[in-house]
Amino acid sequence: MSKFWSPFVSDLVPYVPGEQPKLTRLVKLNTNENPYGPSPKAIDAMRTALTDDLRLYPDPNSDLLKHAVADYYKVQPSQVFLGNGSDEVLAHIFHALFQHDAPLLFPDISYSFYPVYCGLYGIDYETVPLDEQFQIRAEDYARPNAGIIFPNPNAPTGCLLGLDKVEQIIKASPDSVVVVDEAYIDFGGETAITLVDRYPNLLVTQTLSKSRSLAGLRVGLAVGHPDLIEALERVKNSFNSYPLDRMANVGGAAAFEDREHFETTRNKVIESREALVEQLQGKGFEVLPSAANFIFARHPRHDAAALAAKLREQGVIVRHFKQQRIAQFLRISIGTPEQHQALLEGLSDL
């Protein structure tokens, strides 16, 4: 703390990102990165873009990538917003659309950046408890609010809310913006982007960090009614008119165009997830149903924090949360079969 800090900054509780260890020999299963590389076509596109043109600013509208996203999801470019990772997209959403008199609603166990944004922008919020099975209950959101946001699949639980229930939430709050945060949707769910033409209050966010294997590039997007997109563009252009560099634009566009690589790697992650679930259940773990590229598991006889520490001693990093309802769970990112073998060897004496 410094005497130069404003009281506002002194009171901020920032987001704590997952550990990015410097030692490369560690088995890293803690931040939900894709174990398989990006599309070779995306890599080639970025190599081709390494020219003298890097002296020039990138396209502020990111039209190349915007059109690639629009073509992929069969929407109009005017319905697409792009940002420097979905976290920046979400920050602009909170700033542009959630500063109202009534509270914002989101699950009590959810993405931990949501309350950080509320603190940053002075947004009142209420958390809505998940049920005993850690599922979102659509009916619990049918109450006065100034906006709703939830991840689907949820993070860190991995549980999926069916599209019919998503639509139920949207219908119940026609005068509020409903944001469906779909960072993990490609690993087992149906996107709500198919609903945006029916509901002008719906905004869907996604990222290229997970299923497109481009976490190091930082590309996020939102799809919704042009009026909502315009609000985000106003905030963006009052903050940073060039959020995506040339590499992100061409690499992201190529990643969307390479459907074969996307489907192949996505399917490998899903197959590995189901195999790991079965293996952990064989060791006595309770594993929540996951539609993401991670699983959420607890063991009835072993403390989760102690298990995480034990695994780390053996070179395997997983994520442990201290939040009360989930303090006995571990979140384990889906890796390669070799990484899973290292994990299971670390748990061999259970």
Swiss-Prot record:
Residue numbers bearing the N6-(pyridoxal phosphate)lysine modification: K210
EC numbers: 2.6.1.9
The cysteines covalently paired via disulfide bonds are: none
The cross-references to Gene3D superfamilies, in alphabetical order and at most eight, read: Aspartate Aminotransferase, domain 1 (3.90.1150.10), Type I PLP-dependent aspartate aminotransferase-like (Major domain) (3.40.640.10)
Q: Which cofactors are named for this entry?
A: pyridoxal 5'-phosphate
Q: Name one GO biological process term.
A: L-histidine biosynthetic process
Q: Name one GO molecular function term.
A: histidinol-phosphate transaminase activity
* Functional pathway: Amino-acid biosynthesis; L-histidine biosynthesis; L-histidine from 5-phospho-alpha-D-ribose 1-diphosphate: step 7/9
Q: How does it assemble?
A: Homodimer.
Q: Which family does it belong to?
A: Belongs to the class-II pyridoxal-phosphate-dependent aminotransferase family. Histidinol-phosphate aminotransferase subfamily.
Name the record gives this protein: Histidinol-phosphate aminotransferase
Q: Which organism is it from?
A: Pseudomonas syringae pv. syringae (strain B728a)
The protein's gene is named hisC
